[in-house]
């Protein structure tokens, strides 16, 4: 799993926190950030440079003119797919944690209200005797 990341020398992809991608001249610059350890001010990161792929395409759709366009490298596209899987999984785990905490707070509220209702009913019973 994560063969493309491992081919970049990233031995533990689960340590990846986030990534950034920018274009610089004829290159795409990928920067991968790892989770910070306690006591570290900055997250460890690694940077990779991918040359953009050049293609010649029909410019006007009629077939008379051509123009050169640059696209992201196919290898980089595969790496980004793996990074998106990792980063999306982290977001999903955070969303699930938030949902569980919200459900727990709601349950606390429901239980507190039910306890108050039962105590009120008990109070009514003891006053009537």
Swiss-Prot record:
Cross-referenced Pfam families = DUF3461
Going by the entry's taxonomy, the superkingdom of the source organism is recorded as: Bacteria
The residues forming the signal peptide are: none
Please state which protein family the record places this protein in.
Belongs to the UPF0325 family.
NCBIfam families listed in its UniProt record:
PRK13677.1
Q: What is this protein called?
A: UPF0325 protein ESA_03178
Q: What is the lineage of its organism?
A: Bacteria, Pseudomonadati, Pseudomonadota, Gammaproteobacteria, Enterobacterales
